[in-house]
Amino acid sequence: MIRIGLRLIAAMMALGAMSVGATAQQADDPDLVAAAKKEGKLAFYTSFLGAPFHIAAIKSFEKKYGISVELLDVRASELRERIRTEQAAGRFIGDVIQNGAATMIRSQRDGELEPHGGIANAKRLSGEQKATDVLVPSYILAYGILVNTAKVKGEDEPKSWKDLLDPAWKDKILSDDMRALGGGQVMFSVLEDAFGRPFHEKLAAQQPIFSRDVGNDERRVARGEYPLRIPQLFSNTTILKGLPVKLIIPVEGVPYIRFDMARLRNAPHPNAARLFINHYLSDEVQLIYANAGLIPVVPDLGGAIKEEMRALTSAKLLGTTNVDTQDAMMALAREIYK
């Protein structure tokens, strides 16, 4: 009896220890929900360009709270200009914005955002991804290497970013343009920080073929026109399922962009905005992201993630862009990759 009791106590203590660090989803504040429902709607500004998993996240909010979401979904550069124009004219239409972290920091510095007033589910964020009183992480876009499995044998697959320097890949690397904003520039910055300029000089000597037509370039690799492509968005790889391609996660880790959310200055529906941002840190939305090949910012979602997505969502993060060095990095890329 005593032994059984001791074992039971030990098991309960172990279970309690396992739960430490995994903060449960926070209960909705009934006053916030009531105020948000009274506002009835919100305007959401983003640049995911119709990706179905993003639409699913929006619909989950509308279904749960009965609050409609008016969506502005345009390219990042167009989005930034839209906000500048509206706010300069004193027309405050948008409530919530979601964009890359570096761009969001610029928006905050330019006075385009305001404090969100508290997000209960921010307590759930992983230790590496922290919220501020203005910016709240929502998900992570990560990049690896795409290879054509018919052209590249298993033993020849690049396991490291440095494997791209192998002479066998000369004139055979299809790459997003590192000299312009986008995935290529993110990769350039992160690998410059990790390996230094000599790495890029050697990679430039491989004569990578630059392009900015992401969807078509992925298909070119699938067709066998090129054996590999860098950098490859994790989430885009899911679209290529059934084709002779494979995503490689290099041993050093992967470049990434974190997408943050914030309330726009003088948001006309501030309570709905807070509730919306909070919803994006719920299990429901984080699992939508995880099962689409994005990395969630809330840990311990565990068994609900599809088996084929677990390697992607648990990939080691190598680094991301720095808003204060972004322009210098772009200039350096143009200098090295002529």
Question: Predicted segments — roles?
Answer:
Residues 126, 140-143, 169-179, 201-204, 210-211, 280-302, ...:
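Periplasmic-binding protein-like
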Residues 303-338:
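Extracellular/periplasmic bilobal clamshell ligand-binding domains
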Residues 28-43, 47-68, 145, 239:
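Short, polar/charged alpha-helical segment
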Residues 57, 199-202, 259, 268-280, ...:
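Short amphipathic alpha-helical coupling segments at ligand-binding clamshell hinges
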Residues 45-58, 70-87, 91-225:
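Extracytoplasmic ligand-binding site segments that recognize negatively charged/polar headgroups
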Residues 144-151, 188-189, 257-269, 288-289:
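A bilobed periplasmic-binding-protein/Venus flytrap-type ligand-binding module shared by bacterial periplasmic
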